[in-house]
Amino acid sequence: MVIGSEILSEKQMILIGILVVIFVVFAVLVNLLDNKSLNGIKAKKIGDGQHGTARWATKSEIKQTFIPLPFEPEKWRKGENLPAIQGTVIGCRGSGKKAVALVDDGDVHTLMIGAAGVGKTAYFLYPNLELACASGMSFLSTDTKGDVARNYGTIAKKYYGYNVSVLDLRNPTRSDENNILHLVNKYMDLYLQDKTNLSAKAKAEKYAKITAKTIINIGGGDSASYGQNAFFYDAAEGLLASVILLLAEFGDKNERHIVSVFKLIQDLLAKYQPAPKAKPKMYFTKLMDKLPSEHKAKWLAGAALNASDQSMLSVMSTALSRLNSFLDSELEQMLCFGTAIDAEKFCNEKSAIFIVLPEEDTSKYFMVSLLIQQLYREILVIADENGGKLKNRVMFYCDEFGTFPKIEGAEAMFSAGRSRKISIVAIIQFFAQLEQNYVKQGMEIITDNTQLTVFGGFAPNSQSAEVLSKALGEQTVLSGSVSCGKEKSQSLQMIGRPLMTVDELKSMPKGQFIVMKTGTHPMISKLKLFFKWGIKFEEEYCLPDKTARQVCYKNRDELIRDVEVKYPQKKAVAAEIEVSVDDEEFDEFPMRKAKIKT
C-alpha cells in the first residue's frame, strides 16, 4: 500500500507538470495571436523623447530634492529632537510615531491648489504649522473660519513659547490690538527722548510713508495706473504721511491712531477768517504756517500746500475717502490702542499672527490686504537693515488666498520676497480665483514666481485640471493601428501622451497630491490627515470679550496750540521795501499828465 501511494503521488506530480506546461504554452500562443490586435498595443514609454520627455522623479532624485524628517510632534512639544530644518512639508511616509515628512528647505514660494473639501487645511496646512512652530519660524496665517487660530494658538504659545496675536475681524472685541501707526509712534518717541538719534527719526518718517502708501492704495492700483489723477493720489499720500508724523509727535499716547488721522484731516478742511476783510483760509494752511520751514511734515504736504484751494480740497477729500474704511466702532477697539506684535517683534522673536476674516462681511476684507501689505513692507525695511535678508525665515500661510480681495503689490511680494527669506504659501481652490482678483497678467506673475506647486483633488468640471495636466508635460509612448483583412497587419508609431490626463487628475484619491518644483521632475506625494501625523489639538485658543473702551481723538485746536508752543514764531516787523526804478526804463513810454475833472 505504501508503494502504491508513492507511485500515485509521482503520477500526480507528472500530471501537474504537464498541466503547467500546457498553460504556459497556451498563454504564449494567446499572446502571440493577440499581438496583432488592438489590445496588444500598450502605451508604454518608448523612443528618445521625440514627443516629450516628461517623467516622474525617481527615488534617488526625490532624496536629492527633498529632505526626509522624522515627524515627532509629541517629542517636539516637550522640547526634544527639535528640527533644525526650516521649510515646507510636501509629503509623508508612514504614520503616527513613525511618520516621516518630506521637507523642501529651499527659499521658495508655494502654490497649493485643491477644490473645496479636499483637505487643504487638515492634510497640508496643519503639518506645516507644526513644523513652523518646532523649527522656530515666525508665521502669519489667514483663515475664514477661525479654526486655525483656535487649534494652533494654544499649541504655539504653550509648547513652543510663541508670541501669539489673533486679529479677529469677525469679532473685533475679541481680537488682539493692532495699531497700524505703532512703529511710527515708537520711533518718534525714541527721537523725542534723544534729539541726536536721527536714525529713529528717519525710521519714523519711513514707516509713516509706508503706512500712507498702503492706505492710499487700498482702492487698487498705484500712481502709475491713476493717469491724470495721479497728482491727487500722490499728494494725498504725502498729506497723510504728514498728518501721521504730526500726530506721532504731538498726540498723547491714547490719541495716536488712524481714526485720529481721519478726524484731524476732516477738521483741518474747515476754513477760518484771519481778519474781518481777509480771504478765508483753511486750518490746514494755518497749521503748516506754524511749522518751521525745515519740518518734514511740511515738506511731505508740500504738493497739497502749494496747490490751488480747489486742488487742495480734492487732495484732502481723496485722503478722507481712503480713511472712510476705518470708521467702524468695533474696528476702533482693535485699531486705536496698542499692538500685540509689530514687524520687528515678528522678525526677531518667535511670533504667530492669525488673521480671521469673516466670509459674511466683505466690508472688512480690506483690512486683510492692509495688514499683510504693511507687515510685508515693514519686513523689507528690517531685511535691508540686516544685509538684504532676515536672520530667520518667516512664513505667510495665506489660506483662502483666492477668496479675499486683491492684495495690492502681491505680485511684487512673490517676485522679491524669496531672496529676503520671506516664503509665501498661497492656498487656492482654482486658478479662476487668481485671475478674477489679479487679472491674467497678475496671475501669471504669481504662478511664475511660485517655485513649488502642490495640487490634487479637483471638481468634476474643473478647468484647473486641464491647465495642470498641460503643465506636467507629455511623454513619448507607443501607439499604432491594426488592419483586419485577409492578413492581419499592424503599424506602430510614437505619439505624445500627457503624463497625467485630465480624467486621471480628477480621479486622484483623497490625500494624494502631485508636487512640481522648479528644475526637477514631478512626483506623486501622499499627505495624511493631521491626527495620522501624530498631531493632537489642545483646548481652543480664545480671547476674552473686551468691554468697549473709550476712544480718544486728537483735537485740531489742541494740535495747532501744541505746535505754537513747541515752535514759537518771532513776530516779523513790517518794513517797507523801496523799489528804485531807473528812468531809462521809461524812456520808451513817457508818462503823461492826466487831467482830472472835479
Regions found by a protein language model. Give the residues of each.
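A short glycine-/small-residue-rich loop at the edge of a beta-strand within enzyme catalytic domains
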Residues: 62-66, 77, 366, 401, ...
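Short, surface-exposed polybasic-aromatic patches that bind anionic ligands, especially phosphate groups
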Residues: 528
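N-terminal short leaders/motifs
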Residues: 53-58, 77-97, 297-311, 458-462, ...
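Short intrinsically disordered, low-complexity coil segments enriched in acidic
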Residues: 2-3, 464-467, 471, 520-523
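Basic- and hydrophobic-enriched, low-structure N-terminal and domain-boundary segments
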Residues: 1-118, 122-130, 135, 173, ...
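P-loop NTPase motor domains
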Residues: 89-97, 101-422, 437-438, 503-524, ...
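Conserved ATP-driven motor cores of ASCE-family P-loop NTPases powering translocation/secretion/packaging/pilus
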Residues: 414-514
